[in-house]
From Swiss-Prot:
Coiled-coil ranges (or none): none
EC top class, as a word: ligase
Keyword Nucleotide-binding: yes
Keywords: ATP-binding, Ligase, Nucleotide-binding, One-carbon metabolism
The protein's name: Formate--tetrahydrofolate ligase
Length: 570
């Protein structure tokens, strides 16, 4: 079979104007960016405000493995198959970060014959939204350091006289706002800035990947431009010498940051290999951020289609949990059905059984042992009151015997049902049965519920997430986290939801624990306020907000030929 980029390149895309017209957009509601993509205005949602929302389907997965489970393939394949079945369907996915593209994971356009095209345009830059987030974020970092420099140089009283501004009295040891870049760069995790007499007080800083920026979360959670502006104004950038928060509004930089991001608030419209519409907007990671595409994209798609299919990053303990307790809490747009993606390889890898057998070879012992992980994820999603369809993403090496055993095993669970998907190799035709089942699931009664209420304490929310969300026996807080919990409660941030940053490779905090971890303590090492996004991030165990490149990164395979064709992009 050809590579993803070869399949993408050999396909002739429809003009994006035709995709927009078929979707129901008026000419003044979108702005083409070349021939393959377009920015879409929120005015379409206002025009169709009285139209009933589409049924929303959320795609999640079992605990991820290095082999890839195929969530995006399933999301795109389902969209293609739904449309083939005569149901007007639109996909909504995140914009890929160049960190994974040039690192280990690769791009996020789907794959095979279930992908968004042109895949190189999606995976590299798109319409520049991530760069806008980076620029706005780093403007705030520059602004806080400049203010610190001038107040320190002149003293508070002289500064106020010369600038006409009130001194903020920034505590250089409590500057919370780091810098960002859209690459994996471990050497920038911890740095010191301000060296030299004319460069400001020396203080610690560091870089996160742009996908972990609070601005990326704000972009994904904002309802409109006004909401974006207000959320940016609420960003807490530092503490003053009295321990009180200093916001972007107080620093006077919130307006300029919003201006940089003004165009980024519009989702980008592209198409699948079948010519189906797909919105791409925002790109927060699911392990260190909330891991879902934007509310705005969902809102627009909901008025134009009969079914909207979106995906949440990593397993259901990660992206789906945050989709439910953060995104839906904000949007009020609850799912009518869910899809849990699984592969035979994923279950074998999650079995916890060491074996010399090739993971692609039949191994009923490991498959049966690993099934517990799938059942855990089915139960996890079911507790939110949403019908669960299991999508078995078939690989060429899978045997009929193992697939049939898995389908029968799913029948004994709380799942609505299961179907095999061959969207990767066959496109829409490979997922029509899955699409039928998912559509029927959307027509059954659902009773979506949150895992916890906003008015419960942060400590109670952490305990609920640990015990009910991950199966932990208890929660432990470091001394730093305890101090931060006290500060957050004192400053009235206790009503915010929790965004857990942890390893995605286990339901627990320890990536080496496979299957269903039990009787473990969830160690909270740090609590970070995201006042603009509207949640508190709880760092669990050893988690990094800036990834690093591996020993054989993806960029080694990427090049461009004399005709301008990109080579080796995965």
């Amino acid at each position: 079979m050809q590579s993803d980029i070869e399949i993408s390149r050999q396909h002739t895309c429809l003009p994006i104007t035709e995709i927009a017209k078929d979707l129901g957009l008026n000419p003044d509601e979108f702005s083409p960016c070349g021939v393959n993509k377009a920015k879409v205005s929120q005015s379409v949602a206002r025009r169709l405000a009285d139209k009933k929302n589409a049924k929303l389907v959320i795609v999640t997965a079992v605990t991820p493995t290095p082999f890839g489970e195929g969530k995006t393939v399933t999301t795109i394949g389902l969209t293609q198959a739904m449309n083939l079945n005569g149901i007007k369907t639109c996909a909504c996915i995140r914009q890929p970060s160049m960190g994974p593209v040039f690192g280990t994971k690769g791009g996020a356009a789907g794959g095979g014959y279930a992908q968004v095209v042109p895949m190189e345009e999606l995976n590299l830059h798109l319409t520049g939204d991530i760069h806008a987030v980076s620029s706005a974020h780093n403007l705030a970092a520059a602004a806080i350091d400049a203010r610190l420099f001038h107040e320190h140089r002149l003293g508070a009283e002289v500064f106020a006289q010369e600038s006409g501004l009130s001194a903020l009295n920034i505590d250089s040891e409590n500057i919370l706002w780091r810098r960002v870049v859209d690459h994996n760069e471990r050497s920038l995790r911890q740095i010191k800035v301000g060296y030299g007499k004319v460069n400001g007080p020396v203080h610690e800083s560091g870089f996160d990947i742009t996908a972990a920026s609070e601005l990326m979360a704000i972009l994904a959670l904002s309802q409109d431009l006004k909401d974006l502006r207000q959320r940016i104004g609420r960003l807490v950038l530092a503490l003053n010498t009295q321990g009180e928060p200093i916001t972007a509004e107080e620093l006077g930089v919130a307006g300029a940051m919003t201006v940089i991001m003004a165009d980024a608030i519009e989702p980008t419209l592209m198409q699948t290999l079948s010519g189906d519409p797909c919105f791409i907007h925002a790109g927060p990671f699911a392990n260190i951020a909330h891991g879902n595409s934007s509310i705005i994209a969902d809102t627009i798609a909901a008025k134009l289609a009969d079914v909207v299919i979106t995906e949440a990053g990593f397993g259901s303990d990660m992206g789906f949990e945050k989709f439910s307790n953060i995104k839906v809490r904000e949007s009020g747009y609850a799912p009518s059905a869910s899809v849990v993606v699984v592969t035979l390889k994923a279950l074998k890898a999650n079995s916890g059984i060491e074996s010399d057998k090739d993971i692609n070879q039949p191994d009923m012992e490991r498959l049966q042992a690993g099934f517990a992980n799938l059942e855990w994820h089915i139960n996890n999603v079911s507790q939110y009151g949403v019908p669960v369809v299991v999508a078995i993403n078939r690989f060429p090496t899978d045997t009929d015997e193992e697939l049939e055993w898995l389908k029968q095993a799913v029948e004994q669970t709380k799942a609505f049902g299961s179907e095999i998907s061959e969207a990767f190799g066959k496109g829409a035709e490979g997922a029509t049965k899955l699409a039928d089942m998912v559509y029927h699931a959307t027509q059954t009664p659902s009773d979506f519920k949150l895992l916890y209420q906003s008015d419960t304490s942060l400590e109670a929310k952490l305990m609920t997430l640990a015990e009910v969300g991950y199966g932990a026996s208890s929660v432990t807080l470091s001394d730093k986290a305890k101090s931060q919990l006290h500060w957050l409660t004192k400053h009235n941030y206790g009503q915010l939801p929790i965004c857990v940053a942890k390893t995605p490779m286990s339901i627990s905090h320890d990536p080496s624990i496979k299957g269903i971890p039990t009787e473990f303590e969830l160690p909270i090492t740090e609590l970070r306020l995201n006042a603009g996004a509207g949640f508190v991030t709880a760092l669990v165990g050893q988690v990094m907000t800036m990834p690093g490149l591996g020993i054989k990164p993806g960029y080694l395979n990427v090049d461009i030929n004399d005709d301008g064709e990109i080579i080796g992009l995965a």
